Amino acid sequence: NNGYQVDVSALKKKDSKLGKLGGYLSFYIKSIFLCLFHHYDYLYAHYISHCALLIKIIKKLKPSIKVIVNVHGNDVVPEDAHDEKFIPLVKSTLPLIDLCIVPSSYYQKVMMEQYGLNEDKIKIFPSGGINFDVFQEIENAKEKLHLDPNKKCIGYIGRYEKRKGWEVFLEAISLLENVEQYQIVMVGVGEDEEKANALIQEYHLENVIKKYPMQTQKELALFYSAIDIFCFPTYRKSDSLGLVGLEAMACGCIVIASNMAGPTSYIKDQENGFFFKPRDGKDLNQKIEDDKTMYYNETESLIWRIFNCVYFSARQEEKYVKNFEIKYKKQLSKQAKKDIAINKMNASSFNWEK
């Protein structure tokens, strides 16, 4: 641990109410015991709504300990009445912290505007980022997945859950003018999967959409590489970053995302991706259809946008940018090369913390 001593107290997931109660008791007792009988400089608490009371107890016992919290979901942006119950406790705990880690500039704004946290107490760290040794464009991905290499592929990767926007995606697909010209893939599982299957039947898309269960990271990279247009239709306010959008960008997808929440932290509309109105399947459909007439000829347009996606999602990691330039150099016109050079200058000044 690079010279640091780290002890971990973790709350294990339980399904039953009794199991959850026992899990919390065990978690609290272990955490308090560790802090009482060891000298720690820092207490790092992940998901503040579950740890707020514990932080208060430990700060009472050990006033000198510095507290770092990581907020990243409905712990600070409630989605329902159950989440709302924890917000007063969270608000009363925040004055005790020394540093708040957030995954995006969107969540930085939430913590400043809704919780009154000072900017100097907030640090942006994008959820560990992306493993670019895994998430990169894979050649012949469509063939490897037994998809038609001559058809554009439109995809959704994510869970079938409330507010994830899978039904918005299906509405957009149902409105495609010539849906048979495309191939549609959906990857994921979730409690609303049967509802998704019913909606697919209602829209008569059974022979159009190919569904796959959730995949490993390496397998996901293959799907992203096969997808030309990746749709990220979330309308969850608590989607703090949305790693799927960044993973898709790293693999060369054109990303069309809801203009809200986490994706607004890294997508620049019409530069490295596109926005549509949240919960608006018609607008998403129009963005998909409009893609046919965008910037340069079709091949060069795709290369241009792959560059944007790789450059921004790699956060200027040179080896990935150079690999892209070597791979596509011969296929780019002089004008495209000039525009990419200008875009590199613009990207290099892109402030990830604002």
Predicted feature residues:
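A short, histidine- and acid-enriched strand-loop-helix "catalytic/donor-clamping" loop
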Residues: D15, I65-E84, L96-L99
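Conserved donor-binding/catalytic core segment of Leloir-type glycosyltransferases
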Residues: D148-K164, L170-I173, V185
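Donor nucleotide-sugar binding/catalytic pocket of nucleotide-sugar-dependent glycosyltransferases
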Residues: K66-V69, K91-E137, K211-Y212
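Conserved acidic donor-binding segment of nucleotide-sugar-dependent glycosyltransferases
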Residues: D269-Q270, F274-G281, E289-Y296
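A short helix/loop element that forms part of the nucleotide-sugar donor recognition site in Leloir-type
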Residues: V134-D148
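Nucleotide-activated donor-binding/catalytic signature segment of Leloir-type glycosyltransferases, i.e.
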Residues: N197-Q215
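Short hydrophobic beta-strand element within catalytic cores of glycosyltransferases
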Residues: I254-A257
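Short alpha-helical donor nucleotide-sugar binding micro-motif in glycosyltransferases
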Residues: M214-Q215, L222-I227
